[in-house]
A protein has these predicted regions:
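Conserved beta-loop-beta element that borders a ligand/cofactor-binding pocket
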Residues: 1-21, 79
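Residues that scaffold the ATP/ADP-binding catalytic core of kinase and kinase-like folds
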Residues: 21-22, 135
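C-terminal substrate-binding subdomain of Rossmann-fold SDR/epimerase-dehydratase oxidoreductases
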Residues: 34-165
Length: 165
């Protein structure tokens, strides 16, 4: 609203299922790692038939850095100087694939508790990064396997030493 009323350039960024070191403790990657490490069951909703756009934190940061220095300008087609960009990998990953990749990285099998679909949840979410790629040349660089390996190494170090690096 401010952008339209006062001509203040505004950029909104939508992040898609961010994971990596120092991730939110209430999100699936951190919860799953803790459950796997401690031998607790992971509640797998819709029997694992869900997909998400898991995006490693470095790719999120790269997208942010590319956007920060360039405020949107009004154009003839778009008189309000505002833009919204999705930052993600741009493709859905099956939840079970994510869990298996995490199991491999942690060297331990997960205990899975298959559950029905949660009310209000969606089957698939993923970012359309076409506009971000067009305007800023953004392309995610970190594969799921690479990102999970880095996350798992950091997580294990945190749990065994309490080291906050």
């Amino acid at each position: 609203v401010y952008s339209g009323l006062y001509g203040i350039p505004s950029t909104g960024l939508r992040f898609f299922t961010v994971y990596g070191p120092w991730g939110r403790p209430d999100m699936a990657p951190m919860l799953f790692a803790g459950a796997i490490r401690e031998g607790r069951p992971i509640k797998v909703f819709n029997h694992g038939n869900l997909s998400r756009d898991f995006t490693y934190i470095d790719d999120i940061i790269e997208g942010m850095v590319r956007v920060i220095g360039k405020a949107p300008a009004p154009t003839q087609d778009r008189p309000i100087p505002a833009e919204v960009y999705n930052i993600g990998c741009g493709h859905p990953v099956q939840l079970m694939n994510f869990i298996h990749t995490l199991e491999q990285a942690l060297g331990k099998n997960a205990q899975l508790q298959m559950m029905p679909m949660q009310q209000g949840d969606v089957y698939t979410t993923y970012a359309d990064t076409t506009k971000l790629e067009r305007d800023f040349g953004y392309r995610p660089q970190v594969s799921l396997a690479e990102g999970i390996a880095i996350f798992a190494q950091w997580y294990e170090k945190q749990q065994t030493t309490g080291n906050n690096d």
